[in-house]
């Protein structure tokens, strides 16, 4: 075993064959990485391993040679393939003991839900001798904080994200703050951009991307680009000043391309602007099939702004519900600027909303023609000052779902820009 002076940093180990095979997205590792950065903790490596006892043991022993702290998620349940606690104990040849307090907690939680704990559940009360319990406030699987050898500690959490996050905030954060591992206070802010590609944005801010403190890192999403600003200082107030300075510079260079920060989405930003002025919104959708309405209504408080929507997939619904003239459909086709305009005006009139959005297009993979290929989309924005339409050529290569998502984002962004002009 390595000397404690040779170890450094924090590692994350995520356990589960479903993660290894890609059946489940590994959101825990991403969330934990951000938490570690916020705490100013050096984080050097992430690993995913399946539900295999021997591989788990070997990995834990390997990590103990090089790192100060190992964070493990997953494998704490009651079934035979939940091997995390057993494997970690075996890695250091330490026996497991049943913790009476843990078993009592498991039984009490089962009774409060009108259940009787199964015999298998008792396995969750087994912890290595000397380990400290990490109590699970919402589930039955406890975690642990354990220092099996000097200079190396293990923290285990359930794989269920909500349980893991609650336990992390309640117990792990205080432990890390008192551990002496922090290299300062790290803070970060995420800026969201629409209407510019990742490479183009990177060129505009190339000098800022080379900075050391703060750092600026780009991330590409589906239609949007994100820049994360991260700064470190001895106290958070100083770190935030550094972040604010870089954010101001980024906004000056990019203008209205930046639409939000942190948890903002185009939908939430648009709804907030409309709500502040007491205005309402409705939508008419064809190729997005309700995706635009779903994005809007996913935002808490959307009901104060969002009046309703129409999924007008067929020409008959466009004509009968939205009053799209038959001659427009015949002359220009359902996928056209003229029909997008009529859809937006129609749903605005139907619902009595202040603003209305429309989308009509060809999401593919079939249905395209040389004149109107897959990825051709028209969007409309109707408001008190009239209706505008835009043609989008999104192309077929990225697939149907990408076309649908980007179409919804494009029309929301156009409404955002219209609202900025009207402010």
UniProtKB/Swiss-Prot annotation:
Disulphide connectivity of cysteines: none
InterPro entries the record matches: CinA, CinA-like_C, CinA_C, CinA_KH, Competence-induced_CinA, MoaB/Mog-like_dom_sf, MoaB/Mog_dom
HAMAP family in the cross-refs: CinA_B
Similarity comment: Belongs to the CinA family.
NCBIfam families registered for this protein in UniProt: cinA_nterm, PncC_domain, PRK00549.1
Protein name: CinA-like protein
Organism: Synechococcus sp. (strain CC9311)
């Amino acid at each position: 075993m390595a000397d404690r002076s040779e170890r450094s940093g924090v590692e994350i180990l995520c356990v589960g064959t479903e993660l290894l095979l890609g059946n489940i997205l590994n959101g825990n590792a991403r969330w934990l990485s951000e938490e570690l950065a916020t705490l100013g903790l050096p984080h050097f490596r992430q690993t995913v391993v399946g539900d295999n006892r021997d591989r788990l043991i070997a990995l834990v022993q390997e990590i103990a040679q090089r790192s100060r702290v190992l964070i493990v998620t997953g494998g704490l349940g009651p079934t035979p393939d939940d091997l995390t606690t057993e494997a970690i104990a075996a890695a250091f040849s330490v026996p497991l003991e049943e913790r009476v307090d843990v078993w009592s907690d498991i039984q009490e939680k089962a009774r409060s839900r009108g259940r009787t704990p199964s015999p298998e559940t008792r396995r969750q009360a087994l912890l290595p001798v000397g380990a400290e319990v990490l109590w699970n406030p919402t589930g039955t699987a406890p975690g642990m904080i354990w220092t099996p050898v000097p200079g190396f500690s293990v923290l285990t959490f359930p794989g269920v994200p909500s349980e893991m996050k609650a336990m992390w905030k309640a117990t792990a954060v205080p432990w890390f703050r008192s551990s002496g591992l922090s290299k300062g206070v790290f803070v970060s802010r995420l800026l969201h951009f629409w209407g510019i590609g990742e490479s183009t944005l990177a060129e505009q801010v190339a000098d800022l991307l080379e900075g050391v403190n703060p750092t600026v890192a780009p991330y590409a999403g589906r239609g949007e680009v994100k820049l994360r600003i991260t700064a470190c200082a001895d106290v958070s107030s100083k770190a935030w000043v550094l972040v604010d300075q870089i954010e101001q510079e980024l906004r000056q260079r990019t203008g209205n391309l930046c639409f939000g920060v942190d948890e903002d989405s185009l939908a939430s930003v648009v709804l907030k602007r409309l709500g502040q002025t007491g205005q309402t919104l409705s939508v008419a959708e064809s190729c997005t099939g309700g995706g635009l309405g779903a994005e809007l209504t996913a935002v808490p408080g959307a009901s104060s702004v969002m009046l309703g929507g129409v999924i007008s997939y067929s020409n008959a619904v466009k004509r009968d519900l939205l009053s799209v003239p038959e001659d427009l459909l015949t002359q220009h086709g359902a996928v056209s600027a003229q029909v997008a305009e009529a859809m937006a005006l129609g749903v605005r009139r139907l619902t009595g909303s202040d603003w209305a959005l429309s989308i009509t297009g060809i999401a593919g993979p079939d249905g395209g023609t040389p004149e109107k290929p897959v990825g051709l989309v028209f969007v409309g924005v109707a408001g008190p000052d009239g209706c505008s339409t835009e043609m989008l050529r999104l192309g077929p290569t990225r697939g149907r779902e990408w076309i649908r998502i980007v179409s919804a984002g494009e029309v929301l962004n156009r409404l955002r820009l219209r609202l900025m002009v009207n402010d």
